[in-house]
């Protein structure tokens, strides 16, 4: 059976405590988790199982579902896979206990206002100018419902999120939602271009095409201890 758990935390909760709960769930092989904060926003994710993966660019990519005020969302078929990723395809998001955020690639991190995060993630993932410092793309052919084909440059980009042990849980949820919004925006653009209507109005078959063309990939490192 697919067993899940809820993590409901108040305004004072810190990511160090949440991580302890996640580790206990992983030890019990309960990997599907719904996070619920103080503002009724929810994020569903699959926890990576404990593994002795090597350091560097080995990451676990989890497809998240952002569920606004509901226990079910359009992306509820969450997917987890362990993959090896080139460094240029990893967009780092570092969030400390004071809410300060640094983003970018490993050799080009910069401090930003969290309100800029959605646009920064979107620019990295889409890489419309084919910048070699941003995410790679692989042109992929998809079968369309009702017949026909679609070619789309699928981004290889992954967002890697790291918090501190004293990062507020609400800040973590806010960042997760801002990251997911970037992918939602790209999906909406593709849906409008390919099917002539917003993503939320697509049929299930059309939505599956868009989700495969624009996969939502986020990896997480365990929170580090703030100094």
Predicted feature residues:
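Long, low-hydrophobicity, acidic/polar, solvent-exposed interaction domains
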Residues: 1-227
